[in-house]
């Protein structure tokens, strides 16, 4: 079975990209367990707790990330360099994501057959 990586690289609420990626991820998890989730660049903001999307008239989908355990999604990584660049090293995110340096993150991403970017 092909391994599928979902890469979140955009900030939430500025576009529908993050919400659509999350919907695609959850739907795909019903078909396969060979999934990996990566948060890089501004995508690290997807996992911040306490967001207030209603202030910009956006849907609050961030809490849906907490369903990863229910959907057996446990391969989750976050870019350590992206966290440092944004001053987010000591934040408790809404999911447990393993921080990886860019070289290790690229190596891990190389283990996947299909890469979907949101």
From Swiss-Prot:
Its main location: cytoplasm. Part of a sulfur-relay system required for 2-thiolation of 5-methylaminomethyl-2-thiouridine (mnm(5)s(2)U) at tRNA wobble positions. Keywords: Cytoplasm, tRNA processing. This is Protein TusC. Heterohexamer, formed by a dimer of trimers. The hexameric TusBCD complex contains 2 copies each of TusB, TusC and TusD. The TusBCD complex interacts with TusE. It comes from the Bacteria. The keyword Cytoplasm applies. HAMAP family: Thiourid_synth_C.
